[in-house]
Amino acid sequence: MKNYRGVTALLLFVLMAWMLPSHAKPTKTLRFEADTVRVLRNPLNGWVMYLNRNWDGDFWEKAGYDAMKTSDGSVVKVSDYASTAYLRTSWASLEPSEGEYVWRDKSSRYSRMLQSCLDRGLKLALRIVFDGRDQGQNTPMYVINAGAKYYEASNIKTPYMDDPVFQEKYAKFIEELAKDFNDPDKVDFIDAFSPGKWGEAHAVLYQDSRNKAAAFDWMTSLHARCFTKVPIFINYHRMIADSNQNSWSDVVPSDTEGLLLSAIEKGYSIRHDAFGMHDYYQDWEKEFARKWNFRLPILMEGGWITAAHHRYWIDSSGKYREGHSEDVRRGEYEASKEAHVNMMDLRINDEVASWFSLAFDLVKGFVAEGGYRLYPSEVSVPERVRRGADVR
């Protein structure tokens, strides 16, 4: 009863105030149109362009990024449409020998490449891969030589994620990396859980798969402790951290959601690396994204590699025609729209070329409609004010 009396009194006060004569000064209302054309490089907003681990600082011209043809007939710079430059590379390339941190060598190829991006106003993003299957020796050999237990295939040695020697060396590397990249002035985000094939956290190698939860907690806690000033991300897919070497199961492992929630509680946001792949981005993944819409940022990466070995035209959606990369771009765009992603990827090679040369309308569409833009829709101000007076 006490609460009802309080509400009644408040309503009477508001009504009386509304009935009082107004002595407000004349005001003028200004209305603003949203600028949906200009690329705004807000944090976690816009397009992400990918860097090749073999590039140097002059890749802009050599890779055609400064003279990219578009589907409307214009020629543009890719960097004018991107917010972030993303490097996915190996641990071995950044620390070839123990304590040799390549990015700190200003004369190194990596340092020149990253600096060229910063010079253009782009921020950086990183994913460090240590599983070498299908790629090469991604873990530095000093880790293997120190006694880390490993899985070997085609003479490529990948340490088990739950091996104590690996964990010791990897933790030291991440701590050193964070000293230079835990910096929001130059870094947009870090992919902070990257075991398994291609660093996508599936088909993960363990000495004992019963250590899955403990190893997951160790790696996510490490990154959360080291990267305190920049956003950190983890893949949301049903096989997260799982040892299933098929990288897929129609039945979602019972611990998947709990693992992801434990990472989110540590400050992680979420990304997915198979947008547009209808056989790998299914109802479970869509529903997980829906649960976190407008609560966490979501990053998108397309799954199909349209100019390489991927046969994207066999996608179960039936929407992709062989020889038509633009069909895949449109499929990725629609899936991203459904998930309300904050950032989309231009990626590299045929992906970036087809976004611009075959689907430039979608590139501009995401600039206009994706992410966020903060502006006043209208402002009311007094028509006349006295110099030095407060305006309320």
Model-identified regions with their sequence ranges:
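Bacterial N-terminal signal peptides that target proteins for export
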Residues: M1-A9
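Bacterial N-terminal signal peptides
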Residues: A9-W18
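Non-catalytic accessory regions flanking glycosidase/transglycosidase catalytic cores in CAZymes
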Residues: H23-Y86, A92-G99, S108-D119, K123, ...
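Catalytic-core regions of glycoside hydrolase
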Residues: T27-M68, L118, F189-G199, A203-V352
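Aromatic-lined substrate-binding rim segments of carbohydrate-active enzymes
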Residues: S74-Y151, R210-P231
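Soluble or luminal CAZymes and related metallo-dependent hydrolases
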Residues: D105, R109, D162-F173, N211-A215, ...
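Active-site groove signature of glycoside hydrolases
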Residues: Y151-F166, Y170-S209
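Catalytic cores of secreted or luminal carbohydrate-active enzymes
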Residues: E326-R384
